[in-house]
Amino acid sequence: MNELIIATRKSKLAQVQTEIIMSELKSKFNIDSKKLLIVTEGDRKLDVSLNKIGGKGLFVKDIELALLNKEAHAAVHSMKDVPFEVSSEFEITAITGREDIRDVFISNGDISFKDIKKGAKVGTSSIRRAAQLKLLRSDLEIVPIRGNVQTRLKKMEEQNLDGIVLAAAGLKRLGDENLITDYFDPKEFLPAVSQGALGIECLKDGDANKYFEALIDAEATLTVEAERSFMKELQGDCHSLIGAYSEIQGDDLYMIGIYDIGGKIVKKDILGCKTNNIELGKKLAQKILG
């Protein structure tokens, strides 16, 4: 095979993430690859809240069509955007190394989160982030903003927000780590399920799958599978009020989860053998549901 074609979203971050995979393929196999850029439904409807246009697969379905039509050998996704049930024609061939999983605060004026004024306006499009911000500071005014990193930074200025909350992973991959004012403790301010992880999706038994299988990161796979099992048991998606944190502790896996039940955020944790990662995620969800 002379060249691999990898489908991805058009955003700068999606392209940078795909270039990370392309670089790894070049390093391991000395094989060239190129991007096939796709505009997804989630990208087209920037003026509508994600939970109003249906969460599952908004950033994935159009890219999967390119795989079905044999226009690309693989697709690179942020795993937090991938529904817990992948259509039978496809597989998540590899979950690669995980970037910083934390959420961060970017201040409009270099004021730390703990020092922002009473009634400060903070921008986020995530109901998970909004709810956890309110738990930390009930006085905050949450302003919904969507778009890529650059768009949100622009909206922060235009709408005179006191700050915005974003994922550390995207900022670091874009080389914008210097914008971060504060990091939230992921055990207190839980990230999205699979935050910071990249997944490579292929058709089952695809000709090029062997190349992508070589990029699997074992530890990232364990934690992401556990978190996705947790989300599946709750029948949620990346736009539900669900958060998860997981870490490998020797032979064990420690997990924390949050979920909204009737307007109340329920938080539980669990510890167990890491080889039972999928069952652990399921049990954590059952523990939360009571």
UniProtKB/Swiss-Prot annotation:
Enzymatic reactions: 4 porphobilinogen + H2O = hydroxymethylbilane + 4 NH4(+)
Cofactor stoichiometry and binding remark: Binds 1 dipyrromethane group covalently.
Record SUPFAM superfamilies: Periplasmic binding protein-like II, Porphobilinogen deaminase (hydroxymethylbilane synthase), C-terminal domain
Cofactor(s) essential for the protein: dipyrromethane
Lineage, opening ranks: Bacteria, Bacillati, Bacillota, Clostridia, Eubacteriales
Pathway it works in: Porphyrin-containing compound metabolism; protoporphyrin-IX biosynthesis; coproporphyrinogen-III from 5-aminolevulinate: step 2/4
Pfam families the record matches: Porphobil_deam (PF01379), Porphobil_deamC (PF03900)
UniProt similarity note: Belongs to the HMBS family.
Keyword Repeat: no
GO annotations of cellular component type: cytoplasm
Additional remark text: The porphobilinogen subunits are added to the dipyrromethane group.
Keywords in alphabetical order: Porphyrin biosynthesis, Transferase
InterPro entries in the cross-refs: HemC, Porphobilin_deaminase_cofac_BS, Porphobilin_deaminase_N, Porphobilinogen_deaminase_C, Porphobilinogen_deaminase_C_sf
EC code: 2.5.1.61
Gene Ontology molecular function: hydroxymethylbilane synthase activity
One biological process term in Gene Ontology: protoporphyrinogen IX biosynthetic process
Positions bearing S-(dipyrrolylmethanemethyl)cysteine: 238
Function: Tetrapolymerization of the monopyrrole PBG into the hydroxymethylbilane pre-uroporphyrinogen in several discrete steps.
The protein's name in its UniProt record: Porphobilinogen deaminase
Highest taxon above the source species: Bacteria
Assembly and oligomerization: Monomer.
